[in-house]
């Protein structure tokens, strides 16, 4: 599931085509306005990643095309960095527990997004890259589905994944979405 969340996060960045000045190398480099959106348990996992584990993760990311399934990726992670594999397993368990607390309609939307993310990832690995227009349409559809959720469903997302709510409610992000997703 962690890989699926990473795929969704990376796809979101690609979809919105927002210029990113620099990817933070350390948790402390993340702007304070975004740190507050990261659940404490996730923040602790991020802070606990060592320089060696970051290097292993970077190498695995560079070789992402070699891993056709989540299981292959996990096996490579375990071989490359057993300590990072253990940390990733704990984070995956945490995210799974949070996912299970979501309202059923929120779960359905998240499952749909994850499934599409996996599908896009497989297409990418096969050399079939989606067009920016198709990604824009996909993003617009998911944004509309999120907005159509009940207040209760949105409340469970806010409680369990505040970073997602922050993403959908942040004025700067809404401006970017308005600019790039038309």
From Swiss-Prot:
Residues 46-73, 131-152 form a coiled coil. One of its GO terms (cellular component) is extracellular region. The keyword Magnesium does not apply. GO terms for molecular function: fatty acid binding; retinol binding. Pfam families: Gp-FAR-1. Belongs to the fatty-acid and retinol-binding protein (FARBP) family. This is Fatty-acid and retinol-binding protein 2.
